[in-house]
Swiss-Prot record:
Family annotation (NCBIfam families): 1-(5-phosphoribosyl)-5-[(5-phosphoribosylamino)methylideneamino]imidazole-4-carboxamide isomerase (TIGR00007), PRK13585.1 (NF010112)
One GO term (biological process): L-histidine biosynthetic process
Regions annotated as coiled coil: none
Listed name of the protein: 1-(5-phosphoribosyl)-5-[(5-phosphoribosylamino)methylideneamino] imidazole-4-carboxamide isomerase
Pathway annotation: Amino-acid biosynthesis; L-histidine biosynthesis; L-histidine from 5-phospho-alpha-D-ribose 1-diphosphate: step 4/9
HAMAP family in the record: HisA
Biological classification of the source: Bacteria, Bacillati, Cyanobacteriota, Cyanophyceae, Nostocales
GO cellular component, as recorded: cytoplasm
InterPro entries: Aldolase_TIM, His_biosynth, HisA_bact_arch, Isoase_HisA-like, Isoase_HisA-like_bact, RibuloseP-bd_barrel
Entry EC number(s): 5.3.1.16
Length: 257
């Protein structure tokens, strides 16, 4: 399973939000490039970057920081936040970014998503950010009436390469991932699912690993890496592609299997 460190950009700095609240941001580094290099040095084989300013503005804002990170590391990068038109997506791919994460336009402009999936096969990921099972948009500032499961099915039909599922109530809280929501999602789609939000410990990671046969192929880890609750090297050893054993130890997770 992929363990993907998250780098959230706000005003050019690396921050973490609490439940997506811009007023509750915590700065972890003034230099996102150093952070990216640190995660790659510790074994990350993929990075997750969110342009928080972009998500709010509806266009890419932290392009300078994104470009600097892309030049500084050799691992593939996925980026989301403010990608609401073809030009923005093309702009990122021109920098060598591997995947574009689309959120708001998946709800508001599905036709555009279909066109982008056709033009950039395998490179369009849909970010489904949910509050109580319903999809939030525009930097999580608005909540729609669309169910996460409905949107996932529609996006799979339109050609999305994968779904990143974020439970907003858990994001930045360290209270554990929403396993039930991930199971529900995995039951209705066959494309890969990447879990995000609330991961706080190796125990959480092992419970997600139990969902790998159902299609949960990766996990994005943010705050827990920055606070030291999870050490990236340990996480990779526990659930990563080269993990010590394919069957996690029996730590009482049988109910998650």
């Amino acid at each position: 399973m992929d363990v993907i460190p998250a780098i959230d950009l706000l005003e050019g700095r690396c921050v973490r939000l609490y439940q997506g609240d811009y007023d509750r941001s915590q700065v972890f580094s003034e230099n996102p490039v150093d952070v990216a290099k640190q995660w790659v040095d510790q074994g990350a084989n993929r990075l997750h970057i969110v342009d928080l300013d972009g998500a709010k503005a509806g266009k890419v804002v932290n392009l300078g920081a994104i470009e600097a990170i892309a030049h500084a590391v050799s691992v593939p990068i996925e980026i989301g936040g403010g990608l609401r038109d073809r030009t923005s997506v093309q702009q990122l791919f021109n920098l060598g970014i591997q995947w574009a994460i689309l959120g708001t336009i998946a709800v508001e402009q599905p036709q555009l998503v279909q066109e982008l999936c056709a033009e950039f096969p395998g490179q369009i990921i849909i970010g489904i950010d949910a509050r109580n099972g319903r999809v939030a948009t525009r930097g999580w500032l608005e909540t729609s009436e669309v169910l996460a499961t409905q949107l996932a099915v529609q996006m799979q039909e339109l050609g999305a390469a994968a779904i990143i599922y974020t439970d907003i109530h858990r994001d930045g809280t360290l209270i554990g991932p929403n396993l039930e929501a991930l199971r529900e999602l995995a039951a209705v789609i066959s494309i890969p699912i990447i879990a995000s939000g609330g991961v706080s410990s190796l125990t959480d990671l092992l419970s997600l690993l139990a969902l790998e046969p159902q299609g949960v192929t990766g996990v994005i880890v943010g705050r827990a890496l920055y606070t030291g609750d999870i050490l990236l090297k340990e996480a990779l050893r526990a659930i990563g592609p080269g993990r010590i054993q394919d069957i996690p130890p029996n730590l009482g997770f049988s109910s998650f299997a």
